[in-house]
């Protein structure tokens, strides 16, 4: 009997030692987290943190440099970039709800309220220093906060400017206008540069039917999309917005200086394909647009947005870095975010022409000296109007873009378009989180 007890105890000890040797633990199961942050902490090996983005790091050199520089400065952390190539915002909500939790993730500013109000993001107020906050450009701060709480850190800023195809201008014998040009001059030039038909057709201006492209022109007229409380849209009541809508309608239907989406896409799916094919003379873009044109060998220059009533206004979009609320090691995640959104990371993005800095701590001297027009990007940081965000912005934008198709095609009048948008917005924008 004693021998049986001894053998049982010996067997139990062997099983326990085997479990420990294999790294087993009764508490080791039950997490669906996508993070690897716990690895390496006990062994002295670097901890691996996962960073989810819609960019493929193998195709973006500035991301590769950010990763290399961060890991060199933080040898205890390794970064693994994970690409979500399509339908990013909705896909990430599904992943977070299912327990797949990255350590850091990229997020567009218009999605920050949606995520924050659904309790998916970690507040950053206790992690970001006052120095960090004080150095942000004014256009950036609104993009990072929801109801007074900071939920995001800026990846970069994209103030909009007007790109001009200098080859098309030269071929037509038209001089590049001065940087204080007006919307009236812009319209006249667009008409002059719209010629031909069929295979020989070319157009003065084009913008893809995306919300940020359309809003750039609304912002130029100092217009608005949402009411102050965000519960309705103001297209039929805000006079500046109505003026902008009428102007865009006229570009398509009165002056006929814009190709349809179908006409533009015959040159490629990229929204700037017609510009790069020397078929569109002017188009709104951001700093990263220059990299696209440079890679294609496109001849171009840049001007500020044409002025309306003596003032040049541009819109600006902010892409951000956020930390999911359930991230395993928030302090480590913040070290990544602080680098990517801080002086070091944003200097890399600026130097490699992928985005304007969100922080005044970044030195723009060399960037401005590169070209005569780079100063326009930097000047826009002080005056740009933030892209409007809303809890129900995604659904609103889908509806808005669908209605825009009918407006540009001349199926709807501006008044009918404004009324239809406002009526549908009354239902969409009053939905709770």
What are these regions (language model features)?
Residues 109-161, 184, 301-303, 365-375, ...:
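Hinge/lid segment of periplasmic solute-binding proteins
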Residues 123-136, 178-179, 196-198, 203-204, ...:
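Short, solvent-exposed loop/beta-turn-alpha elements that line the ligand-binding surface or hinge
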Residues 143, 300, 350-406, 430-432:
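Long, aromatic- and glycine/proline-rich binding clefts that accommodate carbohydrate-like moieties
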């Amino acid at each position: 009997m004693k021998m049986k007890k001894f053998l049982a105890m010996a067997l139990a000890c062997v099983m326990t030692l085997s479990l420990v040797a294999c790294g087993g633990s009764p508490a080791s199961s039950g997490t669906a987290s996508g993070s690897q942050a716990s690895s390496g902490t006990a062994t002295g090996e670097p901890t691996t943190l996962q960073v989810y983005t819609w960019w493929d790091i193998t195709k973006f050199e500035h991301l590769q440099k950010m990763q290399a520089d961060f890991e060199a400065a933080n040898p205890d952390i390794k970064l693994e970039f994970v690409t979500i190539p399509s339908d990013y915002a909705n896909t990430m909500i599904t992943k977070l709800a299912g327990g797949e939790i990255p350590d850091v993730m990229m997020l567009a500013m218009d999605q920050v309220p949606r995520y924050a109000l659904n309790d998916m993001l970690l507040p950053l107020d206790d992690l970001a220093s006052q120095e960090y906050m004080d150095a942000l450009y004014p256009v950036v701060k609104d993009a990072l906060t929801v109801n007074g709480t900071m939920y995001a850190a800026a990846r970069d800023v994209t103030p909009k400017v007007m790109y001009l195809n200098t080859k098309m201008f030269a071929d037509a014998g038209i001089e590049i206008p001065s940087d204080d040009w007006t919307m009236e001059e812009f319209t006249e030039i667009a008409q002059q540069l719209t010629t031909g038909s069929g295979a020989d057709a070319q157009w003065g201006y084009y913008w893809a039917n995306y919300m940020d492209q359309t809003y750039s022109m609304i912002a130029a007229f100092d217009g608005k999309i949402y009411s102050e409380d965000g519960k309705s849209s103001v297209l039929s009541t805000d006079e500046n917005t109505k003026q902008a809508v009428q102007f865009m309608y006229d570009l398509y239907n009165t002056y006929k200086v814009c190709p349809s989406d179908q006409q533009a896409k015959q040159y490629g799916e990229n929204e700037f394909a017609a510009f790069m094919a020397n078929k569109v003379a002017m188009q709104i873009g951001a700093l990263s647009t220059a990299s696209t044109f440079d890679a294609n060998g496109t001849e171009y220059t840049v001007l500020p947005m044409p002025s309306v009533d003596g003032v040049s206004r541009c819109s600006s979009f902010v892409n951000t870095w956020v930390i999911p609320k359930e991230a395993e090691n928030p302090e480590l995640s913040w070290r990544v975010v602080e680098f990517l959104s801080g002086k070091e990371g944003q200097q890399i993005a600026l130097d490699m022409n992928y985005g304007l800095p969100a922080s005044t701590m970044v030195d723009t001297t060399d960037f401005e000296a590169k070209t005569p027009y780079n100063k326009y990007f930097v000047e826009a940081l002080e005056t740009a109007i933030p892209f409007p965000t809303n809890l129900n912005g995604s659904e609103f934008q889908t509806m808005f873009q669908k209605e825009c198709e009918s407006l540009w095609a001349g199926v709807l009048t501006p008044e009918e378009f404004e009324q239809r948008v406002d009526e549908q917005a009354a239902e969409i924008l009053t939905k709770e989180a």
